[in-house]
Swiss-Prot record:
InterPro entries: Ribosomal_uS14, Ribosomal_uS14_bact, Ribosomal_uS14_CS, Ribosomal_uS14_sf. This is Small ribosomal subunit protein uS14. It comes from Solidesulfovibrio magneticus (strain ATCC 700980 / DSM 13731 / RS-1) (Desulfovibrio magneticus). Binds 16S rRNA, required for the assembly of 30S particles and may also be responsible for determining the conformation of the 16S rRNA at the A site. It holds the Pfam family Ribosomal_S14. Binds 1 zinc ion per subunit.
Length: 61
């Protein structure tokens, strides 16, 4: 419940622009947010392994 309320709070426009922060829309995690994909690192990994992220593959060298 607390995480859901923080997700709603983060989506609102803040009084000052410096107070804005990103939060994962899937799990609500505030840290390790990947701007390019719009999710946190954990959700990014799960989505890329299941093939939900187009053009993303596990690296191998």
């Amino acid at each position: 419940m607390a995480r859901k309320s923080l997700m709603v709070k983060a989506s609102r426009k803040p009084k000052f622009s410096t107070r804005a922060y990103n939060r994962c829309p899937i799990c609500g995690r505030p840290r390790a947010y990947l701007r390019k994909f719009g999710v946190c690192r954990i959700c990014f990994r799960n989505m890329s392994l299941t093939g939900e992220m187009p053009g993303v593959r596990k690296s191998s060298w």
